[in-house]
Amino acid sequence: MLCFVAHQKNNRIYDYLFIGITVILSFICFSNRELFMKLAFIPYRTIRNHEYYRIVTHGFIHADMTHLLVNMFTFWSFGLYIERTFRYMGFGSGAYLALYFGGMIVASLYDLIKRRNDPYYVSIGASGAVSAVLFTSIFLDPWGKILFFAVLPVPGIVFGLLYLAYCQYMA
């Protein structure tokens, strides 16, 4: 057990990497509309111009500070648990990366099909990837507590429902 605990100090590498890239790109895109439109998920352009990179890049930019903070706080709150659990279960970092990027990609597929003929539809944010991490955590420990607004302990399943409501409101 001591080896497992000592090894956990470095478990956040992907969390910090994803958060760092997302924060930096989001801040740049807050003031650079051209880059924002180049990275955003626009199904019409994705299909017509074969710009499939957009299925991933849109997950690293956000509309505003609130959008960025909610997604990154949620990811940070649940990411460590999933990264540790996956390593403990022998899945390793590859499974964690697959979960994150898989969530991002799968969440985009519906809009890719439904909105492929709409040149004005634009989607951004890491909600698909964050939802994959969040709901994997809830699946593994539905009653685990998270400090909502850093003070109110709520079960993960309740936080998940609140996060879904927020995502729906922002959509």
Can you describe what each PLM-predicted range is?
Residues 1-171:
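A detector for small-residue-rich transmembrane helices and their helix-helix packing motifs
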